[in-house]
Amino acid sequence: MDNITHSLVGVALADLAMGRRGTKAQRPLFVGVGVVAANLPDLDLAYSRITPPPIGYLLHHRGHTHTVVGLVALALMLGFAYRFLPSVRKMRPSGQLRFWLLMAIALASHLLLDSLNSYGVHPFYPIDNAWYFGDSLFILEPSLWLILGVAAAWNGRTRAARLAAALPMAILLCTIASTGEIPLESVIALAIAGALFAWITFRLSSHTRAAAALAVVTMIVAGFIGTSRLARRAVVDALAPELRGQTVDVILTPNASSPLCWAVIAIELREADGEYVLWRGTLSVQRAWKAPADCASHQFRGPRDGRIVGDGRLALRDVVHQPLRRLRTLADRDCWARAWLRFGRAPVMEGESIFDLRFSDRPGREFSDMRLIAREGCPPNVPNWGMPRADLLR
């Protein structure tokens, strides 16, 4: 997830951890550690260049610091840094307990949130080096910003603090709405939900308001997770008559603040034909409310209309055929490509490039693109993550 979401979760957890006994003087300390801990796993960006690009960013971001073992190490490091602060040492034992629990939960929240989208994490390394993909949330989710932002604004101790929390969120939400990436009905729903939440929680205490915000956010996330399961089944059923081989993966990404609309990439292995096929389209979970053609977003830069398959909820926009032999040869003989395949989930080879269809529909447009050219030596410091597409390489 984006760092705005991580930070707002850290603020809400801090207000919740303070409880009724927290003082005005303690809030900056609690909020500070909540925000720092909620973002600290992204410290891996600082050392991603120990491996040349693009491999360094692909393999080190969401790398070791996004594992359970890494979180323990970060907790010890952050705890050591805060332990000697006079303001922490002067706390009562109950206050210190809440402070350390806040730090631990905020750290864990980062891994939990990052596990919910199609980018993936590998939390159980080194015991298990496999990637886990939640396929349930877009990396930017304005509904989470709205609820958590309202709580953060109301919980500000002064009018200036409330304005400082509310104004950037309002500008950000309006900017995103103006791009057209969020459909009009979602913009209206967000505005109503934000106003309703602000009205309901206006007279609540800070920690109760934070608890309410976290509860609403949990329900939103649960709704996306549940809809993701429905979307996956709908994709499998719709594509069944089209497929000649084995479906090895279904990649799902919802449109921002629109759980009815999903970007879909299904990967089919056709061993007998010596190829794998990537089926790319848009799905409307409920076509009576939203047609697949109306679900187009920034993720599809081609024509809005696609071939409708199945029961009418899935519109296919691209069918990309890829040679298995070339992919397997690259994995066997090119150590740079083999390192890239420790990240790539939807690999597409076009000309002298390889890129991930999750992030672009052509080479040279985004961070996963890598040129397939002769290089001296192999990339250094390549972590031993599992290959998402090992099922195509066997």
PLM feature spans:
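N-terminal membrane-targeting hydrophobic helices
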Residues: 1-243, 251-254
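Extracytosolic and intramembrane catalytic regions of membrane-associated proteins
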Residues: 244-250, 254-394
